[in-house]
Amino acid sequence: MKIKLICVGKLKEAYLRDGIAEYQKRLSRFCQCDIIELADEKTPDKASDAEKQQIMAKEADRIKKKLGQRDFVIALAIEGKQLASEQFSHLLSEVTVKGYSDIAFVIGGSLGLDQSIKNRANLLMSFGLLTLPHQLMRLVLIEQVYRAFMIQQGSPYHK
């Protein structure tokens, strides 16, 4: 299985990079986990709604180039479905049973995701109504992916 985290924006904070690298290392015994960073567009102060839409559309074009035609796409969006860790673990195992070998998670930039990416997604997923920096969300997501595999293994990691 191959898991891709497609993220808009560069990760600058060393402590987040270190945490993500640790979970990538842990995940290597279960799957190949690639993190793909895409350039984000600069958003001018007081950008109009039209300008924001244009920015999200440009970012969406970059995202689409990284999505495989047969990827199972999970886009993170505040309006998405909230799952308990056990449900998330079950979802990941079900995806492979359905014949998908690649799962792509998409984390948008500061403005969120363009509707075209949400439409392409097989699932919109939310980690709750809290607003988190998209850089921090990467660490939260990769930890939950690792937790999902540990749940499948019956490991005491998940308590």
From Swiss-Prot:
Catalytic activity entry: pseudouridine(1915) in 23S rRNA + S-adenosyl-L-methionine = N(3)-methylpseudouridine(1915) in 23S rRNA + S-adenosyl-L-homocysteine + H(+)
GO molecular function: rRNA (pseudouridine-N3-)-methyltransferase activity
Assigned keywords, A-Z: Cytoplasm, Methyltransferase, rRNA processing, S-adenosyl-L-methionine, Transferase
Pfam families: SPOUT_MTase (PF02590)
Protein EC: 2.1.1.177
This protein's GO CC annotations: cytoplasm
Keyword match Cell inner membrane: no
InterPro entries per UniProt: Alpha/beta_knot_MTases, RlmH-like, tRNA_m1G_MTases_N
Protein's cellular compartments: Cytoplasm
PANTHER family from the UniProt entry: METHYLTRANSFERASE, RIBOSOMAL RNA LARGE SUBUNIT METHYLTRANSFERASE H
Subunit relationships: Homodimer.
NCBIfam families: PRK00103.1-3, tRNA_RlmH_YbeA
Family that this chain belongs to: Belongs to the RNA methyltransferase RlmH family.
Function: Specifically methylates the pseudouridine at position 1915 (m3Psi1915) in 23S rRNA.
Name listed for the protein in its UniProt record: Ribosomal RNA large subunit methyltransferase H
